[in-house]
Amino acid sequence: MTPRGPGRLQRLSQCRPQRGSGGPARGLRQLALAAMLGALAVTVSGCSWSEALGIGWPEGITPEAHLNRELWIGAVIASLAVGVIVWGLIFWSAVFHRKKNTDTELPRQFGYNMPLELVLTVIPFLIISVLFYFTVVVQEKMLQIAKDPEVVIDITSFQWNWKFGYQRVNFKDGTLTYDGADPERKRAMVSKPEGKDKYGEELVGPVRGLNTEDRTYLNFDKVETLGTSTEIPVLVLPSGKRIEFQMASADVIHAFWVPEFLFKRDVMPNPVANNSVNVFQIEEITKTGAFVGHCAEMCGTYHSMMNFEVRVVTPNDFKAYLQQRIDGKTNAEALRAINQPPLAVTTHPFDTRRGELAPQPVG
């Protein structure tokens, strides 16, 4: 019998497949399996690919919203790419260059390696520069204020609801011109004298000579929609028209946010005195329908219930709606006249009753 020497055993161990090995092919199979499971999760959840690739952002209904969405998605993709590279290098170094018991020397050092340090400095600078450039481009687009908006809306926020007014409408095609500002109501908000002191001089208020209840900075219009505890305010807007929003708060800081605008603006009390820009515009609204809006600034007890609805209709329907309002119809009656639901359909009022009297919300 031929003895089995160590050489024979070594050759046999080399021929026998090692447990747990598989090389690159196994890694590719695992990657393909992960991708298939991810696609299956998206399909089963009922999400569309556009929603999944949007990383949680709505589609957007204005050109500014689309630009903001693209900027966000691009920034996330760039961040993920950088993250994958960095994480990959960390794991690769930890797995393949970890210290072994047989190591007797220090690994190769890269300190003071000028070419490497230049590369690791220039690449992040270029990435940040590109992101900064596109951020400024989108920001300037979103903050652009044109001189001739076709619709001007006054937004007044207060704890815990909204008032919307139509200050001016001037369609470029000449089919609708309307001046809805109400200067008389605005003048009525001027602070009254607070009396006279012991010398017979008129007392002035503590805030720039005005009393603390002064609201002369608020705008008032002939056609307004006022939210109440029983009715969500519905702001009716036309599609395809440049719209300007002028915002002011009657009390604390609020925020005007329509998720499909992909844009939130704080609503400040007395914006001029607080050095706050209270005007923004959208180029147009590209989709008709109902879209919920929220206050996005913590403003007190019922902040979470401070909702409103934006109802986007065609320009012809908007003209008919505004004429109904000018003729004295309520917001609900004017909406019904253009075959729209008279009340909000995206949210419901907060029931102010308590205990067993309050009905349970449906749905």
UniProtKB/Swiss-Prot annotation:
- Cofactor info, note text: Binds a copper A center.
Query: Is the Protein biosynthesis keyword given for this protein?
Result: no
Record's catalysed reaction(s): 4 Fe(II)-[cytochrome c] + O2 + 8 H(+)(in) = 4 Fe(III)-[cytochrome c] + 2 H2O + 4 H(+)(out)
Q: Which UniProt keywords apply?
A: Cell membrane, Copper, Electron transport, Heme, Iron, Membrane, Metal-binding, Respiratory chain, Signal, Translocase, Transmembrane, Transmembrane helix, Transport
So what EC number does this one have?
7.1.1.9
> Where do the segments described as Disordered lie?
1-23
Q: Tell me the leader sequence span.
A: 1-41
What cofactor does this one take? Cu cation; heme
Which SUPFAM superfamilies would you find in this protein's record? Cupredoxins, Cytochrome c oxidase subunit II-like, transmembrane region
* Enzyme class label: translocase
Q: How does it sit in the membrane?
A: Multi-pass membrane protein
Q: Which BP terms does GO give this entry?
A: ATP synthesis coupled electron transport
Q: Which residues bind Cu cation?
A: 254, 295, 299, 303
Select a single GO molecular function from the record's annotations and give it. copper ion binding
Asked whether the UniProt record includes Cytoplasm among its keywords, one would answer: no
Transmembrane feature ranges: 71-91, 118-138
GO CC, sorted alphabetically, is: extracellular region; plasma membrane
Q: Where in the cell is it found?
A: Cell membrane
Q: Which family does it belong to?
A: Belongs to the cytochrome c oxidase subunit 2 family.
Other information: Was identified as a high-confidence drug target.
Tell me, in a sentence or two, what this protein's role is.
Subunits I and II form the functional core of the enzyme complex. Electrons originating in cytochrome c are transferred via heme a and Cu(A) to the binuclear center formed by heme a3 and Cu(B).
Name of the protein: Cytochrome c oxidase subunit 2
Its source organism is Mycobacterium tuberculosis (strain ATCC 25618 / H37Rv)
Gene designation: ctaC
